[in-house]
C-alpha cells in the first residue's frame, strides 16, 4: 500500500505514519527527516534547503521532488510506503503522481488529519525539534492554510482522499484510518 499523510504542523502526521508503517509492515518516508539528514550530511541539496527550513518556509519544489525521487528508488519501499510531509502544494501532488507513474507505482490514498489550528500550534510548541520556535510554528500553520489545502481538492477530485478527525487520541486516529482503509 502507498499512502501520503496530509495535515498541518502538529496534526499527528509523524505519529500516524509510524503507527501505520508498523501495522501495515511498510516503510515510512519523512521529508522532514530526509531534509534534516541532507543538511547534517552537508549534501548540496541540504545546503540549499537549510535557509528555507530556518525561516519555516517551504523548501522549493524542485529540491523536494529530487529528494523524494532518490528515496522512492531505494529497495526498502518495494512493498509499500507511507509518505509524511509531502506533498505540500497542489503542484507537488501532481509531480508526485508523475514521479510514481515514471517509477511504475501508484498512490492508493491521501489521508488528511484534520485538526484545529489551536491544537496544531499547541502540539508543535510541545515538541523538542529545533525548528519548532513560536514564530516558525505560526508561519508553518499559515503556509499550511495558504498552500496545502488545495491538495485536498486535488486528491478529492481523484477520489483518493480520506479525511480523518485528528483531534483525538493517537489510538483512535489509527483505528479510524484503518477502518477506512479496509472499507475502501
From Swiss-Prot:
Gene that specifies this protein: adk2
Per the record, the domain of life is Bacteria
InterPro entries attached here? Adenylat/UMP-CMP_kin, P-loop_NTPase
Binding-site residues for ATP, renumbered to this chain = 10-15, 127, 168
- This one is known as Adenylate kinase 2
What family name appears in the similarity comment?
Belongs to the adenylate kinase family.
What broad class of enzyme is this?
transferase
Q: Which SUPFAM superfamilies has this protein been placed in?
A: P-loop containing nucleoside triphosphate hydrolases (SSF52540)
Reactions it catalyzes? AMP + ATP = 2 ADP
The EC code for this enzyme is 2.7.4.3
Record's subunit section: Monomer.
Fill in the domain comment: Consists of three domains, a large central CORE domain and two small peripheral domains, NMPbind and LID, which undergo movements during catalysis. The LID domain closes over the site of phosphoryl transfer upon ATP binding. Assembling and dissambling the active center during each catalytic cycle provides an effective means to prevent ATP hydrolysis.
Location within or outside the cell:
Cytoplasm
Q: What does this protein do?
A: Catalyzes the reversible transfer of the terminal phosphate group between ATP and AMP. Plays an important role in cellular energy homeostasis and in adenine nucleotide metabolism.
Q: Name one Pfam family in it.
A: ADK
Task: Outline the segment boundaries, as ranges, of region: NMP.
Answer: 30-59
Which keywords does the record carry?
A: ATP-binding, Cytoplasm, Kinase, Nucleotide biosynthesis, Nucleotide-binding, Transferase
Task: Give positions of region: LID.
Answer: 126-132
Amino acid at each position: 500500500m502507498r499512502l501520503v499523510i496530509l495535515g498541518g504542523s502538529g496534526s499527528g502526521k509523524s505519529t500516524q505514519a509510524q503507527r501505520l508503517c508498523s501495522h501495515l509492515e511498510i516503510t515510512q518516508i519523512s521529508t522532514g527527516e530526509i531534509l534534516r539528514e541532507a543538511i547534517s550530511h552537508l549534501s548540496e541539496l541540504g545546503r540549499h534547503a537549510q535557509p528555507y527550513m530556518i525561516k519555516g518556509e517551504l523548501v522549493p519544489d524542485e529540491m523536494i521532488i529530487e529528494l523524494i525521487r532518490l528515496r522512492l528508488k531505494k529497495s526498502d519501499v518495494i512493498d509499500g510506503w507511507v509518505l509524511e510531509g509531502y506533498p505540500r502544494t497542489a503542484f507537488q501532488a501532481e509531480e508526485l503522481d508523475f514521479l510514481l507513474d515514471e517509477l511504475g507505482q501508484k498512490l492508493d490514498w491521501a489521508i488528511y488529519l484534520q485538526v484545529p489550528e489551536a491544537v496544531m500550534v499547541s502540539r508543535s510548541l510541545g515538541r523538542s525539534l529545533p525548528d519548532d520556535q513560536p514564530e516558525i510554528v505560526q508561519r508553518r500553520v499559515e503556509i499550511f492554510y495558504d498552500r496545502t489545502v488545495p491538495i485536498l481538492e486535488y486528491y478529492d477530485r481523484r477520489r483518493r482522499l480520506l479525511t480523518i478527525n485528528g483531534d483525538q487520541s493517537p489510538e483512535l486516529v489509527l483505528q479510524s484510518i484503518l477502518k477506512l482503509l479496509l472499507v475502501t
